[in-house]
């Protein structure tokens, strides 16, 4: 799956055509009020660009929340239609379903350039292919019904544009099931693919990956794949304690220890050695007597270790210097997972100083990519999203890319001729 060879919305001729755009309008709602419209704002460049090309109409489709394959007004996209109208400064026609005769009729009789927003795709079990009931029991969708649902979506479109990178790791009907001749990436999706291609397909070296997070077992595939690509690897966050205990028999007190992940540590270290990857682990820690923002604070290093009843919640000043030196050498940086419990101010210094180093690196022209999830939250919290090369919008999707997996929503896009 080449990331850099996918058709872009700019490669299309959409004049006079029905353009189906899969967007990610999965916004947080408080009742019917949108509490953060960032995802809607992020889709505007693609929508406006297509609109300028004078299409017959634009059909916007998204999911919202987890309605589990049935209609649930709590997850209606109606509030999104109102917000989108405000942001675009023009009428958006909200349709009460995403398939069916009413939808077909509305799209067929569209006036020039009309913008439609379909109701939540996940009101149909055929979008995800399965659903869970309230007891967590899974029901699979009938394959014939899925096929029909995909055909109904396809019948609305002459051209397909996907701008929902955050859902690209899901083989859902709206992501992979529209069989139209041209399937292109929108601007958001294109930017994600462009930056991940810069890191994973053709990185400027030295290439540094920074990994945080709690469990080694969650990141084994990620570490294993990156050890084939990077020159340096920082392992921080909670999972560093599993490495330190296994490799140096360091006492870790009540810090996180991942029994399952521990079995893989020596193999990963051996692979790093074999591939000449410099593995960088913290050497000192900021510790706490409990997992709490008001905890007592102390320090420890890897010579004496962390005493009983204490836990490491951040990396200490020597570790920060080690990490800063690695960042200063790197020309390409991918960062997934913070090195400390940044949600508590007393244990945020390691994350904040690493972020400052990353911003400095980006400012002198290096490629600095932040994977989605917690690390993206950190970049937002400290207001530096615009100072980094790229902050991914897709936590799960970016993680799977870094693990070396194919993303169904990307594979389904047309390649450039």
Curated annotation (Swiss-Prot):
Annotated residues that bind ADP are located at 213, 237, 342
Q: Does the keyword ATP-binding feature in the UniProt annotation?
A: yes
Kindly state a single biological-process term from the GO annotations of this entry: glycolytic process
Q: Does the keyword Nucleus apply?
A: no
Q: In which pathway does it act?
A: Carbohydrate degradation; glycolysis; pyruvate from D-glyceraldehyde 3-phosphate: step 2/5
Matching PROSITE patterns: PGLYCERATE_KINASE
Q: Where in the cell is it found?
A: Cytoplasm; Mitochondrion
Annotated binding of AMP, by residue: 214-215, 219, 238, 312, 343
Pfam families recorded: PGK
- Name the residues that bind CDP: 213, 218, 237, 337, 342
Going by the record, the broad EC class of this enzyme is: transferase
Q: Which reaction does it catalyse?
A: (2R)-3-phosphoglycerate + ATP = (2R)-3-phospho-glyceroyl phosphate + ADP
- Where does the UniProt annotation place the signal sequence? none
Task: Kindly list the GO CC terms recorded for this protein.
Answer: cytosol; mitochondrion
Q: Which cofactor does it need?
A: Mg(2+)
Amino-acid positions noted as binding Mg(2+) in the UniProt annotation, renumbered to this chain: 214, 218, 374
Keyword terms of this UniProt record: ATP-binding, Cytoplasm, Glycolysis, Kinase, Magnesium, Metal-binding, Mitochondrion, Nucleotide-binding, Transferase
**EC number assigned by the record:** 2.7.2.3
- Report the function annotation for this chain: Catalyzes one of the two ATP producing reactions in the glycolytic pathway via the reversible conversion of 1,3-diphosphoglycerate to 3-phosphoglycerate. Both L- and D- forms of purine and pyrimidine nucleotides can be used as substrates, but the activity is much lower on pyrimidines. Negatively regulates the biosynthesis of acetyl-CoA from pyruvate in the mitochondrion.
Q: Which family does it belong to?
A: Belongs to the phosphoglycerate kinase family.
Q: Subunit arrangement?
A: Monomer.
What name does this protein carry? Phosphoglycerate kinase
